[in-house]
Amino acid sequence: MKRLQAFKFQLRPGGQQECEMRRFAGACRFVFNRALARQNENHEAGNKYIPYGKMASWLVEWKNATETQWLKDSPSQPLQQSLKDLERAYKNFFRKRAAFPRFKKRGQNDAFRYPQGVKLDQENSRIFLPKLGWMRYRNSRQVTGVVKNVTVSQSCGKWYISIQTESEVSTPVHPSASMVGLDAGVAKLATLSDGTVFEPVNSFQKNQKKLARLQRQLSRKVKFSNNWQKQKRKIQRLHSCIANIRRDYLHKVTTAVSKNHAMIVIEDLKVSNMSKSAAGTVSQPGRNVRAKSGLNRSILDQGWYEMRRQLAYKQLWRGGQVLAVPPAYTSQRCAYCGHTAKENRLSQSKFRCQVCGYTANADVNGARNILAAGHAVLACGEMVQSGRPLKQEPTEMIQATA
């Protein structure tokens, strides 16, 4: 089987190279935005979507135009890749996978991609990029496989390179034969049906006061001044640090779970729906807005979607599988007798069945219900719906996160 893998390193460009990279990223952003604007005009005129083949001719037209001849100074392939990114964004929108494409803003996700023409010298920790030349990078691990494309990106004032490779590997067979249910939560990041518990790292919560202080300082500075730019970079670095802490911890958790279990059953949680604002409208204001806002922050701080993504590809690489089941009533159902009632969940950590008297940790009970749902799905050979797809947190948890 063929495996696609990405290796990300920090670049060490020279002063002139850094200026060129900023210019290339700006050119790619310009091409993307201008093509999107033309697509919008075409749509308003009542015409159909214009595919990539036609958009590529626009690029030739813009390069020959007097006011945009500066596009010739940028490599052609990254500009073409920007148009392909726009085409992919439209396809995702048509398939209802993403929202309608939006214009790119300067300083946010500045990047450009080379599909070919790249040379990698791992022994000397350097890479050759068209129109940029040889550039050093922080070589932290060996790149394996055939290089398919290279993406250069900027984050918090630093430049990074992502090298995507393709390699041929034998079909993996997972060393374990066990199956486990995983219950994701706020008080506990993940609880397994065998009783294993992974505590949350809460990287945002731990840095929330520092972030608020930096944002207050930013509000007192003149917008777009040098001091304002410096303060904004401090906030960006803190956000990056928070995300890195969360991602690193999730990698450790998902690796530990993936190594020990061939089949992992999780809840099919809709995080975007669960973390929607409760503010409501002027005519119909929401209730418990502050408490819901605190719960939303706690949910997003855990990184449930990222944990699911990591589990999926790690299981694929190890020969295992991830199975998503409907999350309805897993926190209210007794894992022993199957009785489902809201009163069974006494608190965040306590579960006691009102019928059979079964007592257990609430998260462990939920994980066992998830495992049982996974067994039912495998037995039936199809997804089993068991009510509305909603995972409820107890009232005391909502209050505690406010």
Curated annotation (Swiss-Prot):
GO molecular function terms attached to this record: DNA binding; endonuclease activity; metal ion binding
Enzyme class: hydrolase
Binding-site positions, Zn(2+): 334, 337, 353, 356
NCBIfam families in the record: guided_TnpB, IS200/IS605 family accessory protein TnpB-like domain
Keyword annotations from UniProtKB, A to Z: DNA recombination, DNA-binding, Endonuclease, Hydrolase, Metal-binding, Nuclease, Transposable element, Transposition, Zinc
E.C. number: 3.1.21.-
Lineage: Bacteria, Pseudomonadati, Pseudomonadota, Gammaproteobacteria, Enterobacterales
Family, per entry: In the N-terminal section; belongs to the transposase 2 family.
Residues forming the catalytic site: 183, 267, 363
Described function: An RNA-guided dsDNA endonuclease. When guided by an RNA derived from the right-end element of its insertion sequence element (IS), cleaves DNA downstream of the transposon-associated motif (TAM). Cleaves supercoiled and linear DNA in a staggered manner 15-21 bases from the TAM yielding 5'-overhangs. Binds reRNA, an approximately 150 nucleotide base sRNA derived from the 3' end of its own gene, the right end (RE) of the insertion sequence (IS) plus sequence downstream of the IS. Not required for transposition of the insertion element. The corresponding transposase in strains MG1655 and W3110 is a truncated pseudogene (yncK).
Organism: Escherichia coli (strain K12)
Biological processes per GO annotation: DNA recombination; transposition
Pfam families: Cas12f1-like_TNB (PF07282), HTH_OrfB_IS605 (PF12323), OrfB_IS605 (PF01385)
Protein name according to UniProt: Putative RNA-guided DNA endonuclease InsQ
Name of encoding gene: insQ
